[in-house]
Amino acid sequence: MAREDSVKCLRCLLYALNLLFWLMSISVLAVSAWMRDYLNNVLTLTAETRVEEAVILTYFPVVHPVMIAVCCFLIIVGMLGYCGTVKRNLLLLAWYFGSLLVIFCVELACGVWTYEQEIMVPVQWSDMVTLKARMTNYGLPRYRWLTHAWNFFQREFKCCGVVYFTDWLEMTEMDWPPDSCCVREFPGCSKQAHQEDLSDLYQEGCGKKMYSFLRGTKQLQVLRFLGISIGVTQILAMILTITLLWALYYDRREPGTDQMMALKNDTTQHLPCHSVELLKPSLSRIFEHTSMANSFNTHFEMEEL
């Protein structure tokens, strides 16, 4: 009875962990999709520079190929574990444990590799200044994608230019910065700010923001936290799965063993009784014959006398 209660408890815990796997995997996929626009625009601004290489080394090994594949596979594995737990199927639970172990090893290797790559990111502050060369094509009809990337980055990171907002005046033929540099953006806001109050423009350059972006953003920190949480949850799930496999295996093994032992005990205990019962009629018959012989001899002796 105690073992049956333990099995129920283990199954409930595995149900909860599988649900947690699904939720965290969906969260990782959502955050990865959320970061996609950031990465695309940053790569557009940093094309053919050392900054582009740093962005790729920092984000893409984690965000695109590995984390997305692991999370998609983990959703399927969670379904496998759920079915195995419901049906108490040893084979499905064994596959579930093996899949979790493989996923955990991949995540661990990816984490170590990413950490080493972050240490080796070959970018310096001086590399950010080279981004000024990308500003000359801003606003041109055939470079709309670059214009969109600059506007997106300046709005999202609340910055203007590379070092300072005056970079737009130096590197382009513009008389004032783009409207995306305004703290409160509206059509013509940058012209008004340039003529009246420069404090209405973002004072910090985008070079520092991009440098901070390479060192880690909130989205990347969320991904790391989710990755660590998934790893810890996988360890707990593997421990519970091994325990459940052990309990189910011995629950299936012990009834057969008990029946064999009971049959053996019954055989050893009941055979003497059957033998005694079989011997009882023979003994009674011998006693009757002996009694009849004794009475006959007594009667014969009395007649002789």
Swiss-Prot record:
Keywords: Angiogenesis, Cell membrane, Lipoprotein, Membrane, Palmitate, Transmembrane, Transmembrane helix
Bilayer topology: Multi-pass membrane protein
Cytoplasmic side: 1-12, 81-89, 246-305
Post-translational modification, as annotated: Palmitoylated; required for interaction with ADAM10. The precise position of palmitoylated residues is unclear and occurs either on Cys-9, Cys-12 and/or Cys-83.
Topological region Extracellular: 34-59, 111-224
Principal location class: membrane
Domain of life: Eukaryota
Family: Belongs to the tetraspanin (TM4SF) family.
Protein name listed in UniProt: Tetraspanin-12
Record organism: Bos taurus (Bovine)
Gene that produces this protein: TSPAN12
